[in-house]
Amino acid sequence: DTIELLKKKIDEADAIVVGGASGMSAASGFVFYYQNDAVFRQIAGSLEKKYGFHNFFDAFYHQGHTRGEHWAMILRETKYLYECQTGETYIDLAELLQGKNYYIATTNQDAQFYRTFPADKITCIQGDFRYWQCSVPCHDQIYENKAQVFKLCGQIENDALPEKLIPRCPHCGAEMEPWVRGYHFLQGDFYQKEMNRYLDFLKRHSSQKTLFLELGVGMMTPMFIKEPFMNMVYQWPQ
């Protein structure tokens, strides 16, 4: 009954706003961010036991390991994101929304939505592991990293990237870092264009019959999807 109701709402809507979060990926088996599974153990290698890591987020935000060890895990995780299969949840959603007027806002950083939807229909609110930025940041630019990720993964030694190979900013020489939300997350020109495209879609359809479809959204960062969706559902006429 719930599935039939969802199909009915999708068919009746003039516009569909999808808010996709980590539950979308977890439902497809991508749980290494939060769990100690085989994927995480491959990413961490010997560092799992050396530092007592339990999952990728635990390792990513840890402060006690070397920079080379830190980068080894980032590189392996990002390489996995490039090589892994497309999640079934994303394939199913693409089928449901085929031919519909929709837009997707996501807090996911794993680029799974880009496997099944066009980039101009997606805004990644919390960044994307496929890009790097200056860690300062000294300038407003993000960099695609696929070629470097695959090259550097082959140069990891004993679960650490040699210090001399750590990616550096081409302008100031500081370390690069993944373009994902953190203390130095770059919300520059690229990010603003992404957000404005999303906000323009909302503005254009604020008086139309709009379906807000919240998928896999928890309470870790409710300010990005859950709370705005609740406010718009309450305020918009249809």
Predicted feature locations:
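Conserved catalytic alpha/beta core of Sir2/sirtuin-type deacylases, generalized to analogous enzyme cores
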Residues: 1-238
